[in-house]
Amino acid sequence: PAQVGYLLEYDFRGDTETNARKGLTYFYLPGTDIEWVIKSEVYTEAETAAVRAHLLTCHEAILSGDRARMEELIDLPSFVDMFILQELSKNPDVGTSSFFVQRDAGGKLCLTAPWDFDFGFGTYSTGVSNLGLVTSGDKVPPHPWFAALMGQKWFVEEVLSRMAEIRPFLEET
């Protein structure tokens, strides 16, 4: 079970009756009050425990800011790209729902399946600040991982480097 692959959604609605009827399992990580819902075929308690333990290890590494430890566990480019996408769309959902992670058995944790940009593209306003999702004063909480990562100079440098790489494409479109 320690090498189980999985797909999870970070979703404040994870504890709903609808998910219970679907047979979906959820759990919390320390310091968070939003559910991680197991969306993949994880059937046993041992598999569920392995998924939670692995995600907890990743969570602790991210919050620690230890880049070397994070690179052992996560696909860092997927985190950089997802952060940029969430920032460009100013997507308020990222801190509370529709945030997916996946891991192939034995692989690294990846941010995947960008989803649910209706609020970011016009049906909701977070007009308190134009400085991004992790700024203080925003009405919607940031995702704790992005908030922690933006406190790391090396992550900001990775984001800036990637933005410089994709900027010409963005300016063309």
Model-derived features: positions:
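Phosphate/dinucleotide-binding and metal-coordinating scaffold of catalytic cores
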Residues: 1-173
